[in-house]
């Protein structure tokens, strides 16, 4: 997503890392589970839900809304050559975490708040 809301542009990595929103997962691969938590002051929702600490949480300082990012131990292939069982298992885990967090179930995970951008309050938990 560029500075103007409503559209996304593919950028080189050197440019993308300077933007407020980034795509953390490459096409056809899931390395990170990202959860959109739109409750006020939701930085510790994972703790309140008795979930493991995410790798990082990026928080909007104005309203407290957060993105929680968990790095998978083993990246998940999502191409046509992937294991359907592995994909379904990962979806079940993601859904269970989203329910416990009270996260937005319609969030696509395509882009997330860039943890390196000064617009967000970022906490690295692990």
Predicted regions and their residues:
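Catalytic "initiation/cleavage/transfer" segments centered on a nucleophilic residue
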Residues: 1, 6-13, 19, 38, ...
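Signature for HUH/AEP ssDNA processing cores
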Residues: 1-66, 72-88
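Short C-terminal domain-edge/linker segments immediately following a structured domain
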Residues: 63-69, 98-103
């Amino acid at each position: 997503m560029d500075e103007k809301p409503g559209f996304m542009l593919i950028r080189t990595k050197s440019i993308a890392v300077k933007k407020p929103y980034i795509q953390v997962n490459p096409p056809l691969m899931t390395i990170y589970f990202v959860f959109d938590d739109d409750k006020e002051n939701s930085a510790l929702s994972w703790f309140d839900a008795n979930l493991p600490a995410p790798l990082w949480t990026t928080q909007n300082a104005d309203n407290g809304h957060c993105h929680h990012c968990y790095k998978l131990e083993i990246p998940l292939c999502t191409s046509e050559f992937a294991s359907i069982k592995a994909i379904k298992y990962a979806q079940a885990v993601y859904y269970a975490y989203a329910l416990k967090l009270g996260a937005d179930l319609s969030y696509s995970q395509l882009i997330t708040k860039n943890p390196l951008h000064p617009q967000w309050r970022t906490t690295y938990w692990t």
